[in-house]
Structure formats: C-alpha cells, structure tokens
C-alpha cells in the first residue's frame, strides 16, 4: 500500500501536497509520501479548497459534495477522501 493513495472500502483516500497558483490543474506525481497536485486557484479565502474539491470531483467523476477534506483545511498538506469514485485517474491508478 502506498502511503499517498489507498482504498478504504469503496472510497479512495489521498494524502496530497498542493501547489496553488499554478498555470494549469495537473497531477504532478509523488512528492515524498504525498501526491502532488498543481491547481490554478490562489490560497485565499478557501478558494483553493473549493477548487480542489471541484477538480477532484471532475477527475473521479463524482459530485464535489462526495469529496471531503479530512485533514489540512488551512495548509498545503491535505488528506482527502473521495466517496465511491466512478473513475480513478490513470496517474492515481499507477500508484495505487
């Protein structure tokens, strides 16, 4: 089991390192024990968190309400749960 991504029942749990204010949204790969994701949103007033949940919902083909930030609301290091994903992105599948 990789410490960055694991299955918990039907859910996928991700330990993330977020790079805000990037030129485009992208999964960059492993960053230590975390999956590094670049997002275009700035880390201001929860915009990055909102953008991240919407983006993960799109990538995993679930409603953004099914993406929960479990740890790290205020920092770059986050633990996120995607409830019953309909699809798992190839970059995530490769390290599962």
Curated annotation (Swiss-Prot):
Signal peptide span: none
SUPFAM superfamilies: YggU-like
Cellular-component GO terms for this entry: cytoplasm
Family the entry assigns: Belongs to the UPF0235 family.
Organism: Vibrio vulnificus (strain YJ016)
Official protein name in the record: UPF0235 protein VV2877
């Amino acid at each position: 089991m990789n410490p960055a991504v694991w299955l918990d029942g039907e859910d996928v749990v991700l330990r993330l390192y977020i790079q805000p204010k990037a030129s485009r949204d992208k999964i960059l790969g492993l960053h230590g024990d975390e999956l590094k994701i670049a997002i275009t949103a700035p880390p201001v007033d929860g915009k990055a968190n909102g953008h991240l949940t919407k983006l993960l919902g799109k990538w995993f083909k679930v409603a953004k309400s099914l993406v929960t930030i479990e740890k790290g609301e205020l920092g770059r290091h986050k633990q996120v749960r995607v409830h019953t994903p309909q699809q798992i992105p190839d970059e995530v599948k490769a390290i599962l």
